[in-house]
Amino acid sequence: MGHLGNGSDFLLAPNASHAPDHNVTRERDEAWVVGMAIVMSLIVLAIVFGNVLVITAIAKFERLQTVTNYFITSLACADLVMGLAVVPFGASHILMNMWTFGNFWCEFWTSIDVLCVTASIETLCVIAVDRYFAITSPFKYQSLLTKNKARVVILMVWVVSGLTSFLPIQMHWYRATHKDAINCYAEETCCDFFTNQAYAIASSIVSFYLPLVVMVFVYSRVFQVAKKQLQKIDRSEGRFHTQNLSQVEQDGRSGHGLRRSSKFYLKEHKALKTLGIIMGTFTLCWLPFFIVNIVHVIQDNLIPKEVYILLNWVGYVNSAFNPLIYCRSPDFRIAFQELLCLRRSALKAYGNDCSSNSNGKTDYTGEPNVCHQGQEKERELLCEDPPGTEDLVSCPGTVPSDSIDSQGRNYSTNDSLL
C-alpha cells in the first residue's frame, strides 16, 4: 500500500539524537541506510525465491496439481508480483527519500500494491469455501469444484481485484483535497498515498474487511465440522478395538476400511491446520495496517508516519511466509527438495511407483510393497498402506473406502496440503 508522509523519517531515526559532529551523524545515517537496504533486499529475495519455488513445484509435479493447490498457485502469484513489482519500488522510495519514477508509475505501482493484497485475501476466502465443500460434501466435491471451475474462479478473483484496485486509483477517485495532497499529486518526486476519507474506508472494507469476515466465518464452520468428524472417528475406533479378535480376522477388510477412513480425516484435519496458519498469518500481518489506515483518515495526527510505514512493511513480509508454511506438507517438502537438488530422485519414485489409469484404478510397478521402499518419514506419510487389488485408491493418498463408488470413481479430495 502507499506510504504517507516522508518515508525517510522511518529510516533516519538515529538522527533523533542531536550529535554535535555532523560527520558522525552522516556516517550513522549512511550505515542505517545500508543496513535497511540489506534487510529490504533479503525480503525481496525471500519473497521471489519462495514463491517461484511454490509455482514451479505445482507446475512440475502432477501430484501437487489439485484444485486447492490451483488456488495456492494464485496466492503465490499475488505474492510473487508483490515481490517483483511492489516491494522493490517501495524500498527505493524509502531509501532514496524521494520517488524517481514519475507520477504515472506512482499511481500504477500503488494500484498493483492494492491489487496484490486484494487478490491474496480473496483467494484465501475462496480457499476457505473450497475446504468447506471438501470436508462437508466429500462425495460431491469433485463434481462441485472441478479444475476448470477452479480456473474460472481464479480468473474472477483477479478481475474483481483489478477493478477494485485500478479503477478508483486510475480514475483519481481516491484523491484528497487538502494542500499537502494537492502539492504531492503535482510533484513528480512525491508518491505519498494521500486519500480521501470515503476511499480509505470503502477500499479497506471491500479489499480487506469484508473478505476477512467471510473467510473467518466459513473457516470457523469448517473447523467445527472437522472437529465433529474427528470425534466420530475416536468413538468408532473405540468400538473397533473392543471387538472380538476372531471377528476382526473374519472381516479384516472392515478394519482396513476404518483405518483408511481415519487416516483420510486425520490428514484432512492437518491440511485444515496448515491453511488455517496461512490465513492467520495473513490476518496478523495485514490487519494492523488496515486498522491504522482507517484511523489515519479519521484522526490525521494520531498515528505517526513511521508506524504506518512499519506496519505496511510487516504486510509486505507476509508474502515471504507462505512458502515456509507449505513445508508442513510432506508433498511440498519432497517437491522443494527435489527442485533444489537436495533429494536424489525423491519424486521419481514418488510420481512413478504408483499411477492411476483412466478408470480411477491404480497401476503398480509389480512390487507388492513398492511404496515402502523410501525410508524417509515423508514417504511413510504419503504411502502408509500397500494397497491390495481391492483398494481403488492411489498409493500416495489416503481416502475413506466409502469414497469410491461402484464404478471406481474416487470422490476424495486427495489434498496434497497435508
Curated annotation (Swiss-Prot):
The biological process GO terms on file are: adenylate cyclase-activating adrenergic receptor signaling pathway; AMPA selective glutamate receptor signaling pathway; bone resorption; brown fat cell differentiation; cellular response to amyloid-beta; diet induced thermogenesis; heat generation; negative regulation of G protein-coupled receptor signaling pathway
Q: Residues bearing 4-hydroxyproline?
A: P387, P400
Q: Which UniProt keywords apply?
A: Cell membrane, Disulfide bond, Endosome, G-protein coupled receptor, Glycoprotein, Golgi apparatus, Hydroxylation, Lipoprotein, Membrane, Palmitate, Phosphoprotein, Receptor, Transducer, Transmembrane, Transmembrane helix, Ubl conjugation
* Residues that bear Phosphotyrosine: Y141
Q: Which SMART domains match?
A: 7TM_GPCR_Srsx
How does the record describe the protein's post-translational processing?
Phosphorylated by PKA and BARK upon agonist stimulation, which mediates homologous desensitization of the receptor. PKA-mediated phosphorylation seems to facilitate phosphorylation by BARK.
Q: Which region ranges are annotated with the description Disordered?
A: 389-418
Q: Where are the transmembrane segments?
A: 38-58, 71-91, 108-128, 152-172, 198-218, 275-295, 307-327
* Presence of keyword Ubl conjugation: yes
The subcellular location is: Cell membrane; Early endosome; Golgi apparatus
Covalent lipidation (S-palmitoyl cysteine) residues? C341
Q: Which residues lie on this side of the membrane: Cytoplasmic?
A: 59-70, 129-151, 219-274, 328-418
Question: Which molecular function terms from Gene Ontology are attached?
Answer: adenylate cyclase binding; amyloid-beta binding; beta2-adrenergic receptor activity; norepinephrine binding; potassium channel regulator activity; protein homodimerization activity; protein-containing complex binding
Where does this protein have compositionally biased stretches of type Polar residues? 400-418
Taking the first listed entry, what is the main subcellular location of this protein, grouped into a coarse class?
membrane
- Whether Transmembrane helix counts among this entry's keywords is yes
- Give residue numbers for sequence motif PDZ-binding: 415-418
Quaternary structure, per UniProt, is: Binds NHERF1 and GPRASP1. Interacts with ARRB1 and ARRB2. Interacts with SRC. Interacts with USP20 and USP33. Interacts with VHL; the interaction, which is increased on hydroxylation of ADRB2, ubiquitinates ADRB2 leading to its degradation. Interacts with EGLN3; the interaction hydroxylates ADRB2 facilitating VHL-E3 ligase-mediated ubiquitination. Interacts (via PDZ-binding motif) with SNX27 (via PDZ domain); the interaction is required when endocytosed to prevent degradation in lysosomes and promote recycling to the plasma membrane. Interacts with CNIH4. Interacts with ARRDC3.
Q: Which family, according to the similarity comment?
A: Belongs to the G-protein coupled receptor 1 family. Adrenergic receptor subfamily. ADRB2 sub-subfamily.
Protein name in the entry: Beta-2 adrenergic receptor
Q: Which organism is it from?
A: Cavia porcellus (Guinea pig)
